[in-house]
């Protein structure tokens, strides 16, 4: 980054500081990951200069012959990975991918069935502070009070009662496998469309380690980062019958020119996903999550639903007599990055919360294995149990430093 250093020392310094943070801390935010150098090179390429409104072969600008190739590569690879009939790789985010699906099939005020945010859903699945909850009549379903797993009988009952035009499955904080086949059966029974937001589990689906929603859903949306380990962005997969409508909803519906440098990075990431090594990586994500969950439970911590089937773990910190906000802060102090998170049947404010969400995608990318999961579990428990003990926190910080120093990353930067 010599050019940047000469041109803008302040921005360069901030980026260098962030690189230092990523190297020195244990990254456990479930929605974050570390992309390859190849993905970063594509995203930082000359494609950032090119406007390309429209789609390959039908652009509103000249000079698009090379970016057309890139977008076709991204679309074709995504189709191959997930077995989709049609793919749109232009959404700038998962939220915009969801918006495009809603705009394709819904009218303002239509009824939609979506997962309660505090039970693990997402803002764009009907939260009243989000456009989805403002534009549409979302009815919430959630998890069972005892098992903390989706109550499919409740989903069916609410679908029969409210007759939604669309049912949305998928979550941002649900650590268990979702039965997409059951959801589609419910949707068919009430004559609803079925959409899956697989943003968190897309990489696991790609590796064949989580049921694929594509054969069951009319529409599937995802981000391209998280477990998929690509650049920050979105994508829509759908049946061919909806292809033209979806494409029109993205452009000119809610977006203008696509970010061709990001689409190039998506293409590179999808190419990585198609390699055998990616399946091994995804299996390590799950193995690490299970080991970490077991370690946390051995330390006496309470996990929502009692464990995990994917990359994600949700810790209920109430028995430690602290809040999610305090837990996030004290863990960050010792070098462990997490996020506070609501838990099912939450009573605290979203700014305070009773839980902490963690995930293993980023640490697995860094090379952490089962032994490191044991140490991380011990560190999390030790830190939270001693959150007011400065001596203990200093010891935890040194243990984090000792652990991260064994795993180099981005050595060429």
Curated annotation (Swiss-Prot):
Pathway annotation from the record: One-carbon metabolism; tetrahydrofolate interconversion; Amino-acid biosynthesis; glycine biosynthesis; glycine from L-serine: step 1/1
InterPro entries, alphabetized: PyrdxlP-dep_Trfase, PyrdxlP-dep_Trfase_major, PyrdxlP-dep_Trfase_small, Ser_HO-MeTrfase, Ser_HO-MeTrfase-like, Ser_HO-MeTrfase_PLP_BS, SHMT-like_dom
Source organism, top-level taxon: Bacteria
Binding site for (6S)-5,6,7,8-tetrahydrofolate: 117, 121-123, 239, 349-351
Chief place where the protein resides: cytoplasm
GO function terms (MF aspect): glycine hydroxymethyltransferase activity; pyridoxal phosphate binding
GO terms classed as biological process: glycine biosynthetic process from serine; tetrahydrofolate interconversion
One GO cellular component, as annotated: cytosol
Subcellular location: Cytoplasm
Modified-residue entries (N6-(pyridoxal phosphate)lysine), positions: 226
Record field: catalytic activity: (6R)-5,10-methylene-5,6,7,8-tetrahydrofolate + glycine + H2O = (6S)-5,6,7,8-tetrahydrofolate + L-serine
Keyword Amino-acid biosynthesis in record: yes
Site positions for Plays an important role in substrate specificity: 225
Keywords: Amino-acid biosynthesis, Cytoplasm, One-carbon metabolism, Pyridoxal phosphate, Transferase
Necessary cofactors: pyridoxal 5'-phosphate
EC numbers, comma separated: 2.1.2.1
Database matches in HAMAP family: SHMT
PANTHER family assigned: SERINE HYDROXYMETHYLTRANSFERASE, SERINE HYDROXYMETHYLTRANSFERASE 1
Job description of the protein: Catalyzes the reversible interconversion of serine and glycine with tetrahydrofolate (THF) serving as the one-carbon carrier. This reaction serves as the major source of one-carbon groups required for the biosynthesis of purines, thymidylate, methionine, and other important biomolecules. Also exhibits THF-independent aldolase activity toward beta-hydroxyamino acids, producing glycine and aldehydes, via a retro-aldol mechanism.
Protein family per UniProt: Belongs to the SHMT family.
Subunit details: Homodimer.
NCBIfam families: PRK00011.1 (NF000586)
Identification of the protein by name: Serine hydroxymethyltransferase
Organism encoding this protein: Bacillus mycoides (strain KBAB4) (Bacillus weihenstephanensis)
